[in-house]
Amino acid sequence: GADVKIEQNYKNGVLQSDNVNIMSRSPIKKLVVMSEQTTFSKVTVTIKAFIDERFAKARCSGAAVHKAVLPVSFRFADSQAYQGSIGIEGISKELDKLVMENLYNTSSFVTRPLVRANLNTSNSPNMSNAFQVSNLSSLADRYGSQYIILGTINSVSTSEVGNNVLTKLMYVPTRTINFDIDVYDAINEQIIFHRNYTAEADWPFKQSEYIDLRSDRFKSSEYGQRVYGLAAEVSKDLVAELQCKPANAKIIDLDGDDVVINVGRENGISPNMKFTLVQAASMSGPNGDNYSAYEKSNSVYKVVSVYPHAAKLHPVDLQNNTLNVNVNDVVTLQ
């Protein structure tokens, strides 16, 4: 929630001016420099801002509910992307491990176990194919998740320095790491996040050598550091994107006037939380495709019972409550 901008101007190696500008909707308690990386042309510094949670949550009601996310194993975009992984064929599993560890350590999410699924999905942020949407929605329902995280490896290829002996002595080959992260919202049935992550670093290993990606030798290399850094960025970006998203839940059962929703204690649901009913309807497009439409109602429900993975809600005003409530309707946290 904080944007920290630091500018330092140098002339002939002498610091001329130093300026720190912090933009945040919530008070910042302190700043801590987490890491620093120096290259020939720039210095990259990672700063952690400690924000007063009382103010942050007051401005972001969605943060009160821990979103259920389902990571799907990384896949290669195509055969060419896979062929470029010679020596590090296990990079997809290593990215799975790194991203999963970061997600598990994020209190904003309820992270489901990694799923290895061969999904026929598009890399485009505009996902309109009904078959793809149906696949992802079914997967989300099966594992009780609203958000599905998809990773696609576009390239991990090495660069060539040519056959010239002098060139080979002077230059070290480089290797790229380029992948996409997409987040699918199963309730709204659309991709809500699409971002590309890319880096290039020296590759000091032999061309045909198999590399143990969990060895200290790989981890300490510049390329290994960039892989680890990008995996950490994914977690930070997902928290920033999803934490304040409206907290939605599906109605999974009806009990008289009460409704049961598919989020519970594990998601941070507590008694007396209030939700607004959003009714779902199935519509048909001009080409015969079916899609869901949602219409917000005036009906308000209050949490009366909380279970590990579900909660029961009761109407606040029975006299003005919507009568035709159905399973698969949606409620949104007020």
PLM feature spans:
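Intrinsically disordered, low-complexity charged/polar segments
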Residues: A2-I51
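A short, hydrophobic beta-strand-centered structural micro-motif
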Residues: M23-S35, P71, M127-L166, Y171, ...
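A structural "domain/chain start" motif
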Residues: G1, M34-F109, P113-R116, A247-N248, ...
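Short secondary-structure boundary motifs at beta->alpha junctions and helix caps
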Residues: Y171-V172, N178, D185-L230, N287-P308
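Short, well-ordered alpha-helical segments
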Residues: G1-N19, Q225-D237, E241, S270
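Amphipathic beta-strand/beta-sheet edge segments enriched in Tyr/Trp
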Residues: K42-F55, L150-K206
